Amino acid sequence: MKTERNYEFRQRMDVVHHPGTRDPEARPEPGEIVIDESWTIVCPAGADVRIANTAADLQDYFRVAMELSLPIHPASEGKSIVLALEPSLAKPLSYRLKAEPGKITIAGKDPRGVRFGGVGLEDILNFREAPFIKVQDVIHERLVTPRMVHSGWGIDQFPDSHLNAMLHAGLDTCVVFTTGVDRTNVGYLDINDVIQRAKNYGLDTMLYGYLPGYKHPDDPDAQEFFESVYTNIFRHYPDALGIMLVGESGEFPSKDPATTGKRHRESLIDGIPDPRPSPGWWPCSDYPKWIARVRDAVRKAAPNAMVVFNTYNWFWVDEERRKEFLKNFPKDVYVQITYDIGMRYKREGIPSAVMDYSLFAAEPGFYFTSESKNAHALGIKPFATSNTAGATWDFGDIPYVPAPQRWITRFKHLDQARRDWDVSRYYDNHHYGWWQSVITDLGKGYFQSPQEDPDELLKKIARRYFGAEAAPLMLDAWAKWSEAMGHYTPGNEDQYGPFRVGPSYPFIFQPNITRTMGQKEIQFPTAPHAHFGWKIIKTFYQPYENIQQFPGKMRYPAEIRSLEKMLSLWEEGIALMEKALPLIPARKKERAERELNMGRFIRCAIITGTNIKRWWLLNNALVASEDPAEALKLLDKIEALAKAEIENARSAIPFVEQDSRLGWEPSMEYVCDRWHLEWKIRQVESVLRGDIAAYREILNLK
């Protein structure tokens, strides 16, 4: 693979029709329909733009992927692929795919159904690796919709090419952070332009509310206030699907005495922190009224708009309090529930919990199951934060977590939640983006009817990606990585630190050698235009304690052993991929090389995550030591660890240079490209020359 410039990944990520898809040795089986250049794509004159776009997309697909030139005509008496509407189909976005000798019909319930039907035909031919299709007559329905994602191209950036990529990945709704009319956290955005262009690709657009809302619903001017914000927004964007709300960005001056009644940054009394939670982190008794105010204001301008409220911020609250909140929750508002957060587990008998988005939680936590069950019983429609587009905070600056067997476990539990509690709407990623991958291909096939068995589908995908000879080895490699994710450590200090940025994470010497009484935390260097940038990176590694897990000093030895096991399994997966590589046909090899390259980068991140825990334990033992001789031995270990981490960072440079998506995350921008890895090396070298050398001098004082 060649070296890429920063952001060059964008030229790859939006490619949906791939040269070399067709197997030159493929031959039709008995009874298969063969599409050749005698066929025509039929798009009726005056067709909806989405149907016309489907015709153009299919024409490009056959030209690029199948090496066939097919014309588009409004009618044809000969062999043809016909695009049509069939309004009698039951569900929106559904389509019928009928293939018979000389004719293939894609009939959508609506124009969006035609768009997804076009992709469905492409998927069949992609798996066949040839323009051959079996006779069939099948109605396809989406089991989950909406499937919503933030941009994987750049925060709130949706060029046409990326909208097209979303469609082909089986996703159906864009999510745009919204701070005001045509405003996002990174500046101006013509939101109506996004809405209209997305519509042309069969996609909806959901607003993620970062809007003013600090008003109590009982205040005399409450209606006027909420209408000035939310009614105004939907007067500007009447075609938006709806709005998403979440406690942390929807705080209000609650009168619930269990809370501070203030914003979390203002919850102080004479500078002393109030131990009560602030309203955004508690199921306040008056929160349902606030939600109803927002709903009424939205629906005044857009009667059919979805209003979604996320209870993520109080996952830790006991079930009875959460249930009481839901009893008063507006029934025509959707409740959003996070799959993974709060899942409790024990590692070597030590209690811990998942603190944010993590594939470690292959199975759901009690918060998700109890909240979904209670919402459904109360007649409230549940929405899942599912992360089923493939990314999490496990490794914050990679395009997806390449552990498909573990994702399949999650998919099966989510599907059971759909059957049991109508959890049939997904927020498929947060702002860390998405990427077309084995994970999106699994989701596209599994979250529709007829539903494919995900384990068999994974085998099909592996054969399609890597060829029949290499597929078993690649599947075994993925299985090792999936097993490895069961040994990951999903704590806040890890997901806001070393695992968020990877091997560029700084190693700060914890004893504070200072003449200016300064603090040790340093600002991680990020682009000034970044949505969050350094604000969501904690550089001074330390345990972030909470009541759901044992303290860090008690957890870390077991977590280090767990990460060592993770690294061992990960390296087994790498070895299997290296063994598979020579068996992969040349036309498929780049995908495998990129998968392996990402696996090697993740290995570096695992090493950093393990080393920083050792670093913290050694630093704290050093601070606690009362014996200079013992302290000097500890300092030797710290110095050796620093040097090893420098080499680990240096080893990651080739991996990020070959794939410019590694080390980047939409809301932080670049955090682990070559520059940041070299910055980390300089930072640790500075610690060796400065703090560690000075502390050695201190210990040798006479």
Regions found by a protein language model. Give the residues of each.
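Contiguous, structured surface segment used for ligand recognition
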Residues: 1-142
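Active-site-proximal beta-strand/loop segments in catalytic clefts of secreted hydrolases
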Residues: 44, 108-109, 177-178, 208-212, ...
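Short acidic, S/G/P-rich loop/turn micro-motifs used as interaction or catalytic elements
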Residues: 46-50, 88-89, 155, 181-183, ...
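N-terminal small/glycine-rich loop or linker at the start of catalytic domains
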Residues: 135-152, 210-213, 383-393
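Stable alpha-helical elements in mature extracytoplasmic
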Residues: 51-54, 58, 114-117, 159-162, ...
